[in-house]
Amino acid sequence: MLNEPLPSSMEDNPQFKEETSLQKFRRRLKEEPLIPLGCAATCYALYRAYRSMKAGDSVEMNKMFRARIYAQFFTLVAVVAGGMYFKTERQQRREFEKMVEQRKAQEKRDAWLRELEIRDKEDKDWRERHAAIEAAAKEAGKRPAPNKIPEQDAARSAIEPADEKSIGVLAAVRDLWMQQK
């Protein structure tokens, strides 16, 4: 029960989901189709005014500049009307995006905490193993050496001289370092 996320009223609604830039552009184009239409009309009026200016037709050029102003006014009205019409939906979308960001931040934080807990557990396990090894080494140092049979000892030392006294890597490096000085 603790691992399950809290239920959200927006989970069941397919309208509220994360979207890519292209999906967002398409959605906005479908929501407010008059804005791109007004922009296209403005561009077309400017193009026609440019062509009229190149041709030297000042009357047509003035008409096209007026048409550009009307097209820009139409675009501005479409922006304002669309903003008023979709105001509540935009507020809901902003709230949803905030919730998504909070959820991602919480997941990131939880993953970080899990990683810290795992590292802490590994560190504790290592310390316990290290303490057990040290305790075993101290115990081995306190035990008396077993009695050796000379024949076996001579044969064993000839075959396996490293078993008699094993030194660690650090001790060997330290000995080499001291010999050089």
From Swiss-Prot:
GO cellular component: mitochondrial membrane
Entry-linked InterPro entries: Hypoxia_induced_domain (IPR007667), RCF1 (IPR050355)
Subcellular location: Mitochondrion membrane
GO biological process, alphabetically ordered: mitochondrial respirasome assembly
Segments passing through the bilayer: 33-49, 69-86
Membrane topology designation: Multi-pass membrane protein
Pfam families noted in UniProt: HIG_1_N
Recorded superkingdom: Eukaryota
Gene3D superfamilies hit by this protein: 6.10.140.1320
Main location per the UniProt record: mitochondrion
Key words, A-Z: Coiled coil, Membrane, Mitochondrion, Transmembrane, Transmembrane helix
Region (Disordered): 136-160
Family, per entry: Belongs to the RCF1 family.
Subunit comment: Associates with the respiratory chain complex III/complex IV supercomplex.
Primary role: Cytochrome c oxidase subunit which plays a role in assembly of respiratory supercomplexes.
The protein, known as: Respiratory supercomplex factor 1, mitochondrial
